[in-house]
Amino acid sequence: MRMNPTTSGSGVTTLDKKTLGRIAQIIGPVLDVAFPPGKMPNIYNALVVKGRDTAGQPINVTCEVQQLLGNNRVRAVAMSATDGLTRGMDVIDTGAPLSVPVGGATLGRIFNVLGEPVDNLGPVDTSTTFPIHRSAPAFIQLDTKLSIFETGIKVVDLLAPYRRGGKIGLFGGAGVGKTVLIMELINNIAKAHGGVSVFGGVGERTREGNDLYMEMKESGVINEKNIPESKVALVYGQMNEPPGARMRVGLTALTMAEYFRDVNEQDVLLFIDNIFRFVQAGSEVSALLGRMPSAVGYQPTLSTEMGSLQERITSTKEGSITSIQAVYVPADDLTDPAPATTFAHLDATTVLSRGLAAKGIYPAVDPLDSTSTMLQPRIVGEEHYDTAQEVKQTLQRYKELQDIIAILGLDELSEEDRLTVARARKIERFLSQPFFVAEVFTGSPGKYVGLAETIRGFQLILSGELDGLPEQAFYLVGNIDEATAKAMNLEMESNLKK
């Protein structure tokens, strides 16, 4: 299934002439196209506008049919800029939805929403393509096994573990470290699990997309010398793209991931940065199509659009797609319809806190706000569950005491509460960790901490064995042995100063 119609040497399309329509109206990225009676395209069909602009430059714009208006007219949304289009231009109905290349040929490459490579590394093998609109797997195909997906990040593995084949939301406002955490996860998963990842950059900064690409080349996730050996495919629809492209780029990335799951029978990681921008683009398109806005100005079809994307992200008997989605929270308000709708689909939430980021604790994951359906004794085991609950209780007690400390000071607390506060502060710092992808900024080498090692470290803090160590020894270290070594170094340094 090809995305664009082929053209013969004379420039005449090989598609039937009767599939030609004409542009009747252009309003920004929305086109109204008139077709001959009885030749109306279906909803979601790809339309191609070919011609020349006023300067004589060739134009090739792909659109997607969104509405049938009556009077033999359809309304379509453009996937690229509509500059230079004029009324009366020919429009070709391809007779099929947008289709994108899939399979091993996509690894190590950057694509746009149409599945066209944008990395200047030459054409991509398009012998295998999938349409971006597909139905979710049937009930009987779904896999219901529960197992944990180890990330090597202490705070995540201990307090809000990810489910293999699950959906995880990364919640946070602007500038608290969502994209850095995603880059670390891609790095850890490629190195520790050898899995294939697909990254969908939905409506984010072009600079960040470029930084991510360079970072992946440096870390070897993208193999420059042998591109097919790469572990990730990138699909970008950035902030400067029209809303149609930003609304569909998530589906393009998902379609590529589905091929690895269904045909190659692999476990795949799908990163979407940022799912809020998908909703935002849908809202823009909805307004352009003239639909009445719903709560807070969002589109009335918000739940349907989100559901059609999320239901395709699942585990089947063939393989799994584990999805990690960054969710921008407008004005840090978790009750906004966009994050609230996303919550309903998630197995785990990793909430990033501005307060922790301000303290310099990275990753700034809020240990009390982050949740996971996997944190149950029958899934993770009694030892992991009990340690996680005790860590949360200690941190919760510290949070309750903070007002008293602010007004009266630490000395007014009971002996037991003072001990709890001291341990909570150590735990808070031990939940920080140096990242591989942040080595350039921190100067500390990155650390991957296994789950057993993480549990052992927190048990030692909770048991009181490390009560004598200074709290700064626990800051930005990997496992607990590094913390004790750091404490000895700090002690030696202070002795030398004396």
Curated annotation (Swiss-Prot):
A GO MF label: ATP hydrolysis activity
Stored CDD domains: ATP-synt_F1_beta_C, ATP-synt_F1_beta_N, F1-ATPase_beta_CD
Sequence intervals crossing the membrane: none
Stored PROSITE patterns: ATPASE_ALPHA_BETA
Catalytic activity field: ATP + H2O + 4 H(+)(in) = ADP + phosphate + 5 H(+)(out)
Domain of life: Eukaryota
Pfam families membership: ATP-synt_ab (PF00006), ATP-synt_ab_N (PF02874), ATP-synt_VA_C (PF22919)
InterPro entries registered for this protein in UniProt: AAA+_ATPase, ATP-synt_VA_C, ATP_synth_F1_bsu, ATPase_a/bsu_AS, ATPase_alpha/beta_chains, ATPase_F1/V1/A1_a/bsu_N, ATPase_F1/V1/A1_a/bsu_N_sf, ATPase_F1/V1/A1_a/bsu_nucl-bd
Keywords: ATP synthesis, ATP-binding, CF(1), Chloroplast, Hydrogen ion transport, Ion transport, Membrane, Nucleotide-binding, Plastid, Thylakoid, Translocase, Transport
Disulfide bonds: none
Localization: Plastid, Chloroplast thylakoid membrane
Subunit structure, interactors included: F-type ATPases have 2 components, CF(1) - the catalytic core - and CF(0) - the membrane proton channel. CF(1) has five subunits: alpha(3), beta(3), gamma(1), delta(1), epsilon(1). CF(0) has four main subunits: a(1), b(1), b'(1) and c(9-12).
Family (UniProt): Belongs to the ATPase alpha/beta chains family.
PANTHER family in the cross-refs: ATP SYNTHASE, ATP SYNTHASE SUBUNIT BETA, MITOCHONDRIAL
Protein name per the record: ATP synthase subunit beta, chloroplastic
Source organism: Lactuca sativa (Garden lettuce)
